[in-house]
Amino acid sequence: MEKANASTSAKTIDQLCKECNLCMHSLQILCVFCRKTLSTAEVYAFQYKDLNIVWQGNFPFAACACCLEIQGKVNQYRHFDFAAYAVTVEEEINKSIFDVRIRCYLCHKPLCDVEKLRHILEKARFIKLNCEWKGRCFHCWTSCMENILP
């Protein structure tokens, strides 16, 4: 990607594309961790997950799918506070879990209400990482469960 305007206030892929007059499928942006160019699918996934771009040296960076998952695992090991059921989470934050943003701890996608409800119905715990509550999205739930099923 050509050097973006250093005065840009873009925080998301969508904002960056609008400010630089680019279409999302033609955007070439590097991963902040491994420096590889994100594929078109990864660019769209990054936007879908409502993640913010990172600015370094007046250049925008995102994160590829592989590095997002690795970073999720690293955060689990380095910043694990504790795990709790939805009732405990709600008591701690004084809000319904349906009223707060909870991201997947692996892929970082914000959980929808159905994914939060699944935690409740299946009595799965949310985990607190670095003072933020996290859970599992449907995609990561399935991949986690594949390892324990016969």
UniProtKB/Swiss-Prot annotation:
GO terms for molecular function: DNA binding; zinc ion binding. Belongs to the papillomaviridae E6 protein family. A zinc finger (unnamed) spans 31-67, 104-140. Signal peptide: none annotated. It is found in: Host cytoplasm; Host nucleus. One of its GO terms (cellular component) is host cell nucleus. Forms homodimers. Interacts with ubiquitin-protein ligase UBE3A/E6-AP; this interaction stimulates UBE3A ubiquitin activity. Interacts with host TP53 and EP300; this interaction inhibits TP53 activity. This is Protein E6. The keyword Metal-binding applies. Keywords: Activator, DNA-binding, Early protein, Host cytoplasm, Host nucleus, Host-virus interaction, Inhibition of host innate immune response by virus, Metal-binding, Modulation of host cell apoptosis by virus, Transcription, Transcription regulation, Viral immunoevasion, Zinc, Zinc-finger. Belongs to the low risk human alphapapillomavirus family. The cancer-causing human papillomavirus E6 protein has a unique carboxy terminal PDZ domain containing substrate but low risk E6s do not possess this domain. Plays a major role in the induction and maintenance of cellular transformation. E6 associates with host UBE3A/E6-AP ubiquitin-protein ligase and modulates its activity. Sequesters tumor suppressor TP53 in the host cytoplasm and modulates its activity by interacting with host EP300 that results in the reduction of TP53 acetylation and activation. In turn, apoptosis induced by DNA damage is inhibited. E6 also protects host keratinocytes from apoptosis by mediating the degradation of host BAK1. May also inhibit host immune response. One of its GO terms (biological process) is symbiont-mediated suppression of host innate immune response. InterPro entries: E6 (IPR001334), E6_sf (IPR038575). The keyword Zinc applies. HAMAP family: HPV_E6.
